[in-house]
């Protein structure tokens, strides 16, 4: 199938046989009429096909399934091609055995040539009328009937559509009349194709005089020298009813400003959408006045033939705003209509172009990830703290050996002092008791003095204990005093810390 954009063809609605002798003679010397032999017909036909592809031809070649009657099994070769001005096709037949002989297709100024077709089965004749156009040598075939069953039985490889018309100068430009032809690409038989002829000088379509002219919007190019504009002639695509209608002309009579039904619904107020509308209006056969049909503003739904034309859109979910987004599969950079749906507590977005579902994260997943991050940070921090505690405990084991000796010595001294004081107090009490009978006032004074002495001794002991604690704290690391975690994890420091608080509370 030829490229649709390159050749400006929407559908195969006209079938034409054209003259390629000029292009073939200019492009490939092997394609000259004087050099054709029965031995190298296949090579010449291949060369012709290559030349036509290089020239970007916009013709469709549909030919009847003629098979040659000779000993050669190759059905793609010619039989009895003469190099004179009178070119003869001899001994061709249809698949059912009906012979067709086409003789004396002249290149002079004669208007008509009658040929006959012999049928072995029914012994009847078919008349093929060939005529010339005033603007050029254009031959027309009238009442040419091709059985669709025979066409379907014929293999596709045997259809060499150029064989009947190659290397014959100005042979047939167009098949016309009532023809049943096989639409090879779409597989549809087209009925009642109206007669047309082509002017080879201007490459424009000239309707026949005997048939009415359908109203078709056409673009013609009168410049024959510009080979790059070979695809300038465009045709509007026929409606779907044209393939099954008995009268093709009535179906083709359409208003030129008819709205086109396109698969892409474009929003207003955008320069890109306007350019797309103009291109679509030219392809759909609208007028070139710049008047684009009014299209209702709807959400953009992109439906391409290469993608899923009917995407499944979930019923649940709320519609999102139209936003520019590039799908990961269909790679469409446009505003795609997305829908968000909650499936198994996972949010998904559905692309209407290809039906792709992109998974999105829920809040629960995000919260779990945040928790994991926090726990990882805490674990790292706790590991550092544990390391500090281990270092502290190791240091404490080394320092307690020195501090305990000092504290024990001081405690012993304090205890000795206390004992001495107690002994002194007892002595004083004894003395006081002995003196009670004599002087009550003196006893009271003595008791008061003893109490004061005891309080002083207690204060001295407390001061000694506080000094020892301060010495221990100064000998340890600063982390021991500053770190909150060390107070929580170390039992030794916890006991000392609360003991110190108890002593301080007693002093207060």
UniProtKB/Swiss-Prot annotation:
Annotated region described as Disordered, given as residue ranges: 20-51, 203-296, 399-484
Coiled coil: 356-433
A biological process from GO: regulation of DNA-templated transcription
InterPro entries associated with the record: Znf_GATA, Znf_NHR/GATA
Transmembrane segments: none
Entry-linked SMART domains: ZnF_GATA
Residue ranges, compositional bias (Polar residues): 203-224, 248-266
GO molecular function: sequence-specific DNA binding; zinc ion binding
Skewed-composition ranges (Basic residues): 269-279
SUPFAM superfamilies reported in the protein's UniProt record: Glucocorticoid receptor-like (DNA-binding domain)
Protein keywords: Coiled coil, Metal-binding, Zinc, Zinc-finger
Zinc fingers, GATA-type class: 327-354
Biased segments, Low complexity type: 23-51, 225-247, 399-482
Entry keyword annotation includes ATP-binding: no
Name of the protein in question: GATA zinc finger domain-containing protein 13
The organism's taxonomic lineage, starting at the top: Eukaryota, Amoebozoa, Evosea, Eumycetozoa, Dictyostelia
